[in-house]
Swiss-Prot record:
Gene this chain is encoded by: SEMA3E
Compartment annotation: Secreted
Disulfide bridges in this chain: C109-C119, C137-C146, C274-C386, C298-C346, C523-C541, C658-C733
Name of this protein: Semaphorin-3E
GO CC entries: extracellular space; plasma membrane
Signal peptide: 1-25
Major subcellular location class: secreted
Every Ig-like C2-type domain range: 651-740
Basic and acidic residues: bias regions: 759-777
Taxonomic source organism: Gallus gallus
Pfam family, one: Sema
SUPFAM superfamilies per record: Plexin repeat (SSF103575), Sema domain (SSF101912)
Length: 785
């Protein structure tokens, strides 16, 4: 194979690529910061691992997705539309509802100064109301409206009908603006929302509306309660078996009044209200009497006690456990700095959250004072607590609370103690600028060596990262292992929403214009050897003695007793002992012969199947038995694509061995013999008269009428470099030449090579200006082969 001879521009590009693609400093034998597998949209599609849904109207305007395992449907709310999609395959058997703004709503909206897009009806609320109905609310051209959708029972052939006779005003239930931040949760027929409740987007509040209980909200124009919040998520998490003690937790960011060093500091908050709050009797009438909040911290400990904070909450995910009172909270955060951009994921346990809300209150004596711990007497019942038996049972409703307790909660909504993450640090940090992380979903998996939380992280360019993190107690550090990088969509597009089904092992991903589903795993993609499977460290996968396949814990469809898996350490040598895994790989070592022209560039190509492996290059010179590691410099550059020689020297000739290293497992994956062709011999070859042979090119089998040339030009070239197996090379070159002829009839016409001989060109200089040809250039197919 001939190394392609590049122009000066090509050399410059390759050199720049080499500098950019060099391995970073401190690169270890296994770089788990790189994805083990990187799968394109086409590869996912070819593997039948994904399915996509496009709206037949050409647009979707996605704002919300609701995964309903009972109905076995994914409900989607967008612009003027609702969809019901099958969880098994979202592209099949879908139902749709067209729900636009009324002409009157749209007309009034435009008169008020909004554009036509804003005056559509964007569905922002979708909740399962009961077994047969959904609650849906839309922006209604800046005039929110709510209704019910009949979905029936799963046996009713996927019923999906809008009940238009039940329209209700949606103020306090749905935002006016389709782009404003919003969160909602439906509990016992009561809708709890965090939103901006007015036309101009100035009145931020937490509401409870809908059913038998009194409508409540936070007090308007109270910056100590909410100051320009961005609502992210909300969940009902019980504290105990007493349902009267249930609380709703709201996650949001806001400008922090207690930040003494900056008036524009942004903090992430956890707010809390009692589900059965009825407000006060004489003060805070129809207002929350139990609203409290505290800071949610996600930071990297630094030297001298100065931490790096990630204060902007992007997304939050609640991982349910067997104990519904103690789910695990995952927060995806970003920095608020205009200089430094980074992302982090922190994990919180409910015990830490409850301890913060049961701790001391924050207090400020006056404008000239700093925020401090409140050390005075706390009234009874404890401000912010619910009217329940757990609280003593003396009060059946918050309306009966003493004015002192209600007033204290009203004036002291902020807790002094922040909520800090597990291990006092993030489980994952991204500061390389490669990804902008936006969404998170988590699945808990039982593996051979323990329990792991698999993170699925959505980015702003349509990529999903599949990651696990492992905590090292000895070093108090986290190891992040990126298992897969999945290009879910054909073109880069921000991921707006993700829903996860552990039951089906499927991830549902929403963007503004398209929805996709992706299977959690495809174990056979890691490789066909035991070592490949164990080195992957995917808790879903294990070596079963024959292939890399889905791992099932003992007693759960365990088909084979032979299971090899080591997620924590990836110790393939120990797990695969006796499997002859090294021999299997070495037998597959690919051998190649590459010819390069002296003083030109050549790339010895190899792209490792896994990006986590360290790639080493060794060379064995002619007539030598010793191998030595290739030393890189400004002329020889190690790239992700292989080993690049910017300018070949005669001494570069030899046999090159490409090795990958992972967890002490060394694979020799490619053996390349590099032959150097002296520049003088190439000049001699091109100085001969080959016009007739080149103009006719190679005789193709289907074109017997073309005169056969006695000696194609490449044969003499092979004689110059000393290659003797003419028959094999001739068959290959005929195949390349004739394939190229069929594919590029116009581009490869005889006129293209008319002036390949410099002597002929000099004879023709009387007719046209003399232009020296690129006499080193060869047919591209041969150069690239």
């Amino acid at each position: 194979m001939l190394g392609r001879m590049a122009s000066a521009q090509d050399l410059l590009i390759l050199a720049l690529c080499g500098l950019l693609l060099e391995l970073p400093a401190g690169y270890h034998a296994t770089d788990t910061r790189q994805p083990r597998l990187r799968l394109s949209h086409k590869e996912l599609w070819d593997l039948n691992r994904t399915s996509v849904f496009h709206s037949p109207f050409g647009y979707l305007g996605l704002h919300i997705m609701l995964l309903d395992e009972y109905q076995e449907r994914l409900f989607v709310g967008g612009r003027d539309l609702l969809y019901s999609l099958s969880l098994d395959r979202i592209s099949n058997n879908y139902r749709e509802i067209h729900w636009p703004s009324t002409p009157l709503q749209a007309e009034e909206c435009i008169i008020k100064g909004r554009d036509a897009d804003e005056c559509a009806n964007y569905v922002r609320v979708l909740h399962r109301y009961n077994r047969t109905h959904l609650l849906a609310c839309g922006t209604g051209a800046f005039d929110p409206v709510c209704t019910f959708i009949r979905v029936g029972h799963p046996s009713e052939d996927h019923l999906f009908q809008l009940e238009s006779h039940k329209f209700e005003r949606g103020r306090g239930r749905c935002p006016f603006d389709p782009t404003s931040s919003f969160t909602s949760i439906l509990i016992g027929g009561e809708l709890f929302t965090g939103l901006y409740s007015d036309y101009w987007g100035r009145d931020a509040a937490v509401f409870r509306t809908m059913n038998r209980m009194a409508h409540l909200r936070t007090e308007p124009d109270s910056e100590h309660l909410l100051k320009e919040p961005k609502f992210v998520g909300s969940y009902m998490i019980p504290d105990n078996e007493d349902h009267d003690d249930n609380k709703v937790y709201l996650f949001f960011t806001e400008k922090a009044l207690e930040a003494e060093t900056s008036t524009h500091a942004i903090y992430t908050r956890v707010g809390r209200v009692c589900v059965n709050d009825m407000g006060g009797q004489r003060i805070v009438v129809n207002k929350w009497s139990t609203f409290l909040k505290t800071r949610l911290v996600c930071s990297v400990p630094g030297r001298n006690g100065i931490d790096t904070h990630f204060d902007e909450l992007e997304d939050v995910f609640l991982l349910q456990t067997r104990d519904n009172k103690n789910p695990v909270i995952f927060g995806l955060f970003s920095t608020t700095s205009n200089i430094f951009r980074g992302y982090a994921i922190c994990v919180y346990h409910m015990a830490i959250v409850r301890a913060a809300f049961n701790g001391p209150y924050a207090h400020k004596e006056g404008p000239e004072y700093y925020w401090a711990l409140y050390e005075g007497k706390v009234p009874y019942p404890r401000p912010g607590s619910c009217a329940s038996k757990v609280n003593g049972g003396l009060y059946t409703t918050t309306k009966d609370y003493p004015d002192e307790a209600v007033h204290f909660a009203r004036s002291h909504p902020l807790m002094y103690q922040p909520i800090k993450p597990v291990h006092k640090r993030p489980i994952l940090v991204k500061t390389d600028g490669k990804y902008n992380l936006k969404q998170i979903a988590v699945d808990r998996v039982e593996a051979e060596d323990g329990q792991y939380d698999v993170l699925f992280i959505g980015t702003d360019n349509g990529i999903v990262l599949k990651v696990i993190t492992i905590y090292n107690q000895e070093t108090e550090s986290m190891e992040e292992v990126i298992l897969e990088e999945l290009q879910v969509f054909k073109v880069p597009i921000p991921i707006l929403s993700m829903e996860i089904s552990s039951k089906r092992q499927q991830l549902y991903i929403g963007t503004e214009s398209v929805i996709a589903q992706v299977k959690f795993h495809q174990c056979d993609m890691y490789g066909t050897a035991c070592a490949d499977c164990c080195l992957a460290r995917d808790p879903y996968c294990a070596w079963d003695g024959i292939s890399c396949s889905r791992y099932y814990p003992t007693g759960m469809q365990a088909k084979r007793r032979f299971r090899r898996q080591d997620v924590r350490h990836g110790n393939a040598a120990q797990q695969c002992f006796g499997q002859q895994f090294i021999g299997e790989v070495l037998e597959k070592t690919e051998e190649r012969l590459v010819y390069g022209i002296e003083y030109n560039s050549t790339l010895l190509e190899y792209t490792p199947r896994t990006l986590q492996a360290k790639v080493n290059w060794f060379v064995q010179r002619a007539h030598e038995t010793k191998k030595e590691e290739v030393k890189t410099d400004e002329r020889i550059i190690k790239m992700d694509l292989g080993l690049l020689f910017l300018k070949l020297h005669r001494l570069d000739a030899g046999t090159y061995f490409c090795q990958t290293v992972e967890h002490s497992i060394v694979h020799t994956v490619r053996k390349i013999t590099l032959e150097i062709v002296e520049e003088e011999r190439v000049d001699e070859m091109f100085s001969k008269d080959y016009e007739e042979e080149i103009s006719h090119k190679m005789p193709c089998p289907m074109q017997s009428n073309i005169p056969q040339v006695s000696k194609p030009w490449y044969k003499e070239f092979l004689q110059l470099i000393g290659y003797s197996n003419f028959q094999r090379v001739e068959e290959y070159c005929e195949k390349v030449w004739c394939t190229d002829k069929k594919r590029k009839k116009l581009k490869m016409s005889p006129s293209k090579w008319k002036y390949a001989n410099p002597q002929e060109k000099r004879q023709d200089q009387e007719k046209k200006a003399r232009i020296r040809p690129e006499h080193y250039r060869l047919p591209r197919n041969i150069a690239d082969s």
